[in-house]
Amino acid sequence: YMFHLMD
């Protein structure tokens, strides 16, 4: 989604 949290 932004970083490596939820794509």
From Swiss-Prot:
One of the GO BP terms on file: defense response
Source domain of life: Eukaryota
Record key words, sorted: Amidation, Amphibian defense peptide, D-amino acid, Endorphin, Opioid peptide, Secreted
Modification D-methionine, positions: 2
Major subcellular location class: secreted
PTM annotation (Aspartic acid 1-amide): residues: 7
Similarity field: Belongs to the frog skin active peptide (FSAP) family. Dermorphin subfamily.
Role according to the record: Has a very potent opiate-like activity. It has high affinity and selectivity for delta-type opioid receptors.
Protein known as: [D-Met2]-deltorphin
